[in-house]
Amino acid sequence: MPALTYLLLAAIGASTVHSLPSQQSCNAPVTPSSFSSTSLDVVIVGGGTAGLVLASRLSESKKLQVGVIEGGYDRTNDPLIDVPNAANALGYQGAVFGNSTYDWEYTSVPQRGLGGRVLSYPSGKVLGGSSAINGLTIQRGSREDYDAWGNAFGNGPEWTFDALLPYFKRYERWHAPTLSATGDLNSDGLSAVHGTDGRISISYNNFFTGVDIPLTQAGIALGLGPTQNPDGGDDSLFPNFGASHSLDPATGNRSYAANGYYGQTERCRSNLHLLTGAVVTRIIWDKKKATKAVGVEYAVGNDKFTVKASKEVVLSAGSLRSPQILELSGVGNKTLLESLNIPVVVDIPQLGENLQEQFIAGTDFLVRDGVVTLDALGNNATFLAEQQNLYRTNKTGAFTYLSNVNAPTPIRSLVTEDQYKTMRAALDTYLASQTLTPLQIVQYNLVKQFLDGGKVATSSLLVVASGGLVSTPAAGQGYISVVSSPAHPLSRGNVHINTTDPLAYPLIDSAFLTNPWDAQATINVMKFVRRWVAKSDIIESPGTPPQAADEWSDDQWIAYLQSVLGTAHHPVGTAAMASQKLGGVVDPRFKVYGLKNVRIVDASVFPMHIGVAPSSTTYMLAEKAADAIKKDLNAY
């Protein structure tokens, strides 16, 4: 555990544990055996971001007996999850990532675009899934991103921004911002597009570090904002109020699927049954109707059990696990299944393909003396004591702080017009040399429209107000780490099984930088970052890479990118919601093509990345899926 994270927990951990109310089930404890004998209508595989939304909403109907199987355990009220700077660990390295109690600890296959590097793939191994360990960022993509779901991918008008907005608002309990980078606190536009009665709290920082206003104003001076309403369909440029997060301002704690959708009400429902610590190994099919699911098999340690589902099985195991479960059950690419001697139930060649993952590439900078960053929590005892007191008494201050400067930006705004024309011509040449799937043709045409239009965010800038992301910070110094990433990466990977062992992890190939656009675009963004932060007048000097990088060639920048690139932990797309002629896996009502009663409800159904962190969109689609399932089962 990093020293600073340990310091944070030592400062606030005990008080946090004892101050939080515990939640108790009103029902008898659920055991693997008792769950197996329960009569269920719907079995939800995965108690994560989407799965718990479904569990809560479906069990509102007394017509349904709902079961949830989650591989992790219930860790609500755990300070490593609840306190932002403990779980988030000041820049993506910390107490929950790489900790097998909280993280499945997936890894990629060696990445051919990164010289064979193997990357970690954190994924939440607790009730609430990755909503329990993510960076708490709440963002919506652009109107164009969601309109494409409905129009370009053949899902119809119910999958456009205006049609989806009510489902975004349904999950939200929005709190107006209290700070602004420009002094303008008019949030009427935001208020109009957010809900206030939902389950997940959304709020803004109540504390700014010494870098937030200068860096935002430097971006504005370069023509990149401000935007007053990034959630109304135009998500690009520097937001005036900073990034919004799933943080409850009343408690100073993370708001996530487990404490938002599995509270005391759900725990006391007699028609909602939750089993934790169990891994689903396969779907069980009707012997007479091979495409009809009648239940699932699950493992607890070395023991296996089955449970029946009289109506539906819903996979909410995430972009990396939902395809694995289907393949183990005989659904997927026929060639792969036959090579493993798995009887084929339905041949779906594109299941597990279309993996899209945003990556992060960091650069860090030493700030000038007197500029406060989160490094001061470890460097300045007076500042630490002040922030401890603020958190203990008001649940405010640095312990609730999350990255504030988060600017999805059109890359055309960050490079010269000549640079852009050269990049675009190279992209066209590369794509013309490739054999593309029908889905990829639609995706790449959309991204080219986004790029040329110069409005939709196609790159992303994120400031971590501390050092340590790229290199080890010097003692007593303050730093910032700036993350550059493609909002709509063009490299396409996949996730598949290579064994019939259901407890083995799938092979995850993100295929980072296999499309040259991703590398060229990112190094140009990193070059822009150096110009941008220098304009803010808070930087003493570049850290990593050093000042000499200003004279680097593109090849040197690409070598640096290959050495520092990491996953953003935003995998989507491996069971795309799209028409069958495009190679889609699920239909607009989340049903798997060719199967009678199996749905997928998680980020794997995104047909294309929406350019921002996927958690908000995942909550939204789960709310929408709950309505679809209730209607189809006549369970209102």
From Swiss-Prot:
It comes from the Eukaryota. Its EC number is 1.1.1.-. The active site is at H570. FAD binds at T49, A50, E70, G71, W104, N134, G135, L136, T137, V280, A603, P614, S615. Residues 1-19 form the signal peptide. GO terms for molecular function: flavin adenine dinucleotide binding; oxidoreductase activity, acting on CH-OH group of donors. The keyword Cytoplasm does not apply. Glycans are attached at N99, N253, N333, N380, N394, N498. InterPro entries: FAD/NAD-bd_sf, GMC_OxRdtase, GMC_OxRdtase_N, GMC_OxRtase_C. The keyword Flavoprotein applies. Belongs to the GMC oxidoreductase family. This is Dehydrogenase ARMGADRAFT_1018426.
